[in-house]
């Protein structure tokens, strides 16, 4: 029986974050590509003098776990819903995108929680 796209998607959706990370690395090696998120740099004003649009969706990126990794792991688990093993891997493999496409208010709240735990993050 042939494997369908739905079968592949179902399989991938059941992988842990660590397993997904390993899968991405294998794809990069096999196909000679990189799995980097496309980030558009926000410039000043556009050529026509138009003001740049205010960003409405943000990615929360953990950049450093700080001295107390346990606190960072707890916050990562609370924000992402990951299991202990996956959260620990995310904290140890910084920079790590914790949340994608969240509102400015949510992103600021996550940043506050992360910084209170002694870790550092960026909003992109």
Curated annotation (Swiss-Prot):
Family matches, as InterPro entries: Ribosomal_bL12, Ribosomal_bL12_C, Ribosomal_bL12_C/ClpS-like, Ribosomal_bL12_oligo, Ribosomal_bL12_oligo_N_sf
One Gene Ontology CC term in the entry: cytosolic large ribosomal subunit
The entry's keywords: Ribonucleoprotein, Ribosomal protein
GO MF: mRNA binding; structural constituent of ribosome
Single Gene Ontology BP annotation: translation
Pfam family, one: Ribosomal_L12_N
Protein family membership: Belongs to the bacterial ribosomal protein bL12 family.
Function recorded in the entry: Forms part of the ribosomal stalk which helps the ribosome interact with GTP-bound translation factors. Is thus essential for accurate translation.
Subunit annotation: Homodimer. Part of the ribosomal stalk of the 50S ribosomal subunit. Forms a multimeric L10(L12)X complex, where L10 forms an elongated spine to which 2 to 4 L12 dimers bind in a sequential fashion. Binds GTP-bound translation factors.
Full protein name: Large ribosomal subunit protein bL12
Organism in which the protein naturally occurs: Sulfurovum sp. (strain NBC37-1)
Gene from which the chain derives: rplL
